[in-house]
Amino acid sequence: MKFTINFSANLTAFLLSVFLSVWMTPFIVKTLGVEAFGFVHLTQNVINYFSVITVALSSVVVRFFSVAAHRGEREKANAYISNYLAASVLISLLLLLPLAGSAFFIDRVMNVPQALLADVRLSILIGSVLFILTFLMAGFGAAPFYANRLYITSSIQAVQMLIRVLSVLLLFACFAPKIWQIQLAALAGAVIASVLSFYFFKKLIPWFSFRMKDLSFRTSKELFQAGAWSSVNQIGVLLFLQIDLLTANLMLGASASGKYAAIIQFPLLLRSLAGTVASLFAPIMTSYYSKGDMEGLMNYANKAVRLNGLLLALPAALLGGLAGPFLTIWLGPSFSTIAPLLFIHAGYLVVSLAFMPLFYIWTAFNQQKTPAIVTLLLGAVNVVLAVTLSGPAHLGLYGITLAGAISLILKNAIFTPLYVSRITGYKKHVFLKGIIGPLSAAVFAWTVCKAIQFIVKIDSWPSLIATGVTVSFCYAVFAFMLVCTKEERQLVLKRFRKTKGAVNL
């Protein structure tokens, strides 16, 4: 029941983020211009490079707290959060100077038009405050995770998104539109989210109290040592996820990176959805590990890969299959020429993102060294390929996209299931089974998209939405009849009858 509630809340938050992106992007592009819009994401990417330092703590505190609390070791769990809070304050103070320096020297790192330089610098300064606030509050995310009430996190994220959008509209209406106003709006949303996170932390974990006697170098060292490989991994993640816009800016110019920033939002939303849904399976997998139930962990992990893949296959197929008409209707005919980029993104994301729930297995086992090294190496491969293919090979934005596709498939679809099978002691192919159903469903949905376009001209929002609904219905029937197990079909029918009975009442 909790999984259903958590899943529904996460799906609602994702749909809200899609709606807000579709609605806000054309507005911001038209208001600020394509070049300026590119710097909205680029400035945040620059700030996120500092997460290499902060992730050493933030990536492990939730896991350490949850395992200790599930085992009844409340004193130990209390100490983990207390040490995290103290260490995060100290690290934040140390980061103030380099964050400020990145703002003032940004024009030496990337191509920034002189007319936008002051705006970009102020945007980075405000974004730095947002970054530090998010880091400080990360420890309070342990409460919903420990209680397996992740719908609380999704609800807070939804509120944060709404506050951000409303703040952007208000600032643009009251002042001359600038890039920094978007960061200020994001900061306003983060402040509200922080207040809510703290409230629910105290409500879900009333036994926690910050005590000076819990602060110890030994506990902090334990967190840092466990998170050290997370920092190495984060370097690789940044080389995967947040180097493409910088590469486009340096190799192809501000205009090309602005266009790429507009369309890259949807692949990023798919990644976000995959990560969010994968996290829903993490509490149960952590619980299986804590109890030493490896058979249960293996079965649940395979189910997680298949369900995560099924959820991603539909939006990915819609994104790739309807890329041309979608970009034309959404941003104008000038963007339709880069529609194949979305098709490439959709194709490799279906294959690679389905395996993300498996990340939480090596986190539970505290076996992060090898994944971190592999992520770092393949992240470097991604950068080399992106620069080579976009520049010397003259493939432009397509080179950057292909580089990401090759690197991410190698990391997620090949290395991840093989490594997880090794640390759990199972055969190499065990964790590859879950991808077959989602992949076949994605191909089916993409085929339906193309078939409809041969019959009907899609040139307006109503026709695009109608096509999306039709494809979704066909996909649901295909997945229900051919991909879901007999037990899952019975469960769906049982809940449908229960819902129908409640409505009739």
Swiss-Prot record:
InterPro entries the UniProt entry points to: Poly_Biosynth_Transport, Polysacc_synth
GO cellular component, one term: plasma membrane
Coiled-coil region list: none
The organism's place on the tree of life at top rank: Bacteria
Keyword Chloroplast: no
Organism whose genome encodes this protein: Bacillus subtilis (strain 168)
Name of the protein described by the UniProt record: Uncharacterized membrane protein EpsK
Biological process annotations from GO: polysaccharide biosynthetic process
